[in-house]
Amino acid sequence: MASLIYRQLLTNSYTVDLSDEIQEIGSTKTQNVTINLGPFAQTGYAPVNWGPGETNDSTTVEPVLDGPYQPTSFNPPVDYWMLLAPTAAGVVVEGTNNTDRWLATILVEPNVTSETRSYTLFGTQEQITIANASQTQWKFIDVVKTTQNGSYSQYGPLQSTPKLYAVMKHNGKIYTYNGETPNVTTKYYSTTNYDSVNMTAFCDFYIIPREEESTCTEYINNGLPPIQNTRNIVPLALSARNIISHRAQANEDIVVSKTSLWKEMQYNRDITIRFKFASSIVKSGGLGYKWSEISFKPANYQYTYTRDGEDVTAHTTCSVNGMNDFNFNGGSLPTDFIISRYEVIKENSYVYVDYWDDSQAFRNMVYVRSLAANLNSVICTGGDYSFALPVGQWPVMTGGAVSLHSAGVTLSTQFTDFVSFNSLRFRFRLTVEEPSFSITRTRVGGLYGLPAAYPNNGKEYYEVAGRLSLISLVPSNDDYQTPITNSVTVRQDLERQLGELREEFNALSQEIAMSQLIYLALLPLDMFSMFSGIKSTIDAAKSMATSVMKKFKKSGLANSVSTLTDSLSDAASSISRGASIRSVGSSASAWTDVSTQITDVSSSVSSISTQTSTISRRLRLKEMATQTEGMNFDDISAAVLKTKIDRSTQISPNTLPDIVTEASEKFIPNRAYRVINNDEVFEAGTDGRYFAYRVETFDEIPFDVQKFADLVTDSPVISAIIDFKTLKNLNDNYGISRQQAFNLLRSDPRVLREFINQDNPIIRNRIEQLIMQCRL
């Protein structure tokens, strides 16, 4: 029958050519393993004594808090705050345009009753009446006069706990602060020739650009950062600002060395990385209440941005590694909401972003050293994804967030639809952030990480800015293009082809005729007949079969058979039949692998449902080992696979091994198996449902798990193509004879075809459900 193809794949010996092995290593996607290759990986260049390089800074970066500087007299630049930090009472600062504005600021200590004090203002002794009623706060008072020989008037004031004050020249005015900390505001004095006003500071001061006014206000309200209040901070002379600091520019090309044919170029670049996540959401067949998989998949993004006046076209590919698998099971009924597997990235995961742009730095990126980058962090927040149920309120997966932090950069190769090119792979480590994610209308909540359901949260892209430096060995002739030597990446072009093929395969489920399906399921499909629909099959038959079997060897089904073989040899001398459940578990272990999970049912908290579902997962192997004349789930699975291969336009020899392997593991996930003992039938499914009933009446009887374990050890195991509920429904509505019932229980293909040809809606509906489960 059709399932012969799986047995052939399991038992055939195969050869491996070295070229095939190398190609497979280059295209295999691994998960849950991250290898830090280091900055010199995959350069393809001879080992030489090169230096460690440098991470370059940019002269365009302006400090937020510049200082402290020693007391001095100077003309401060326009649009910069002078943040003054006096340590004692007295005159803090004074400034004048020598025409119509003389402004000075006086600091008064706490708890001072009204009194007259003498202050030196602009070189002249002045008597000023001051007061400060506050018990804790210091008081800054502005004293102003508009003529050289006029009297001073008081303005402000500013009641301050941190004892900080600030003044700025901006837009024809001199700005200061007033009010009371921590709720200060700014005020101004209109001044002619304001840009020529000289300021004399009598205390240490800092310089803050106007763009950071909010930071300045924060300091006025709450004080300087703790590091500024230690004795290790020594004020400098203001002339230190004029010292020229020679730094590498953010965007420049430097010739490091040059010979007649080759030269070393250092490329320093500002870089803007934009990327987005992509996800695959696969819904299971059936009534529409179950999802089989929600997973991340690689995402390409192309964009343009401006760098030093130059328009740069960039291309990124985002992929993830080290995913965490979660699941949700709402129950065993067909209308219970279930997500078999959904991926979440957390602190043990990594995000890879492959970046390439059309600038000169990437044109000859083959032999590279001294590769370094400084990147900002970015927070990625999940959105809301609604699970559209046929009836009832929809559950919603909502929330979740992670922050990405730069963890290294190496060379890589990107593959697009048309071209492959060498690029840089930026690796990001993750930390979880608020909010947590949950699934509404379920008990899933308070979990941290970013789920794959809606990772972009409606954003077109996430953005990371930073700087990049590398030294590249390039031809001295700028018109010559270095041949690209491809290096290995996690994602290659094959992944894109497989994604398109999966979508096409799932869409073809609607077009399969059931009579054709039963016919195909009865054919002994071998390797050649299964793949005969592919172009150039005859020419590539040997190599293609080898590739399929090589890939299949690593499948879950093949690994299960390996485990079965080992456990059979181990159990051969230790099987002892007895009345205890413990000995039943041991005798069953040769094929069920449940002895380590069910050791003492009488004291176990596990239910019968848990035990039967554990046993049922290995009944497929038992059925394969004792092939009967009835049709089984693998026959249907192989027939559907054959039909879809024949109709597919995307299938190719490269994608076939992955598709066959994936189909063997994922087609018809909800299977049920039965054993027959005279008039009694025991039926158990992988979803934990179990039935025991009589064939004559279809009346249920108590399910004896010990008897079930005994029977499956010695008796043939049969696929429950037509399960108990379908049989009972068929009998209640149409009435079936005892012989018809036995034939359906044995999955007799001839009887199944008769019911389908008669257009029996109950049988057709059951087969349609099985076909819809054949999804990738």
UniProtKB/Swiss-Prot annotation:
Site annotation Binding to sialic acid: residues: 101, 190
Reported effect, residue 241 to H: Complete loss of trypsin activation of VP4, resulting in a blockage to viral entry
Effect of residue 391 to D: Drastic loss of infectivity by blocking the host membrane permeabilization after virus internalization. Almost complete loss of association with liposomes
Effect the entry attributes to changing residue 166 to G: In strain: Isolate MMU-18006
Entry GO terms, CC: host cell endoplasmic reticulum-Golgi intermediate compartment; host cell plasma membrane; host cell rough endoplasmic reticulum; host cytoskeleton; membrane; viral outer capsid
Motif (YGL motif): 448-450
Pfam family, one: VP4_helical
Location of the region described as Spike head in the Swiss-Prot/TrEMBL record: 65-224
Stretches assigned to coiled coil: 484-511
Note: In group A rotaviruses, VP4 defines the P serotype.
Protein name as catalogued: Outer capsid protein VP4
Native organism: Rotavirus A (strain RVA/Monkey/United States/RRV/1975/G3P5B[3])
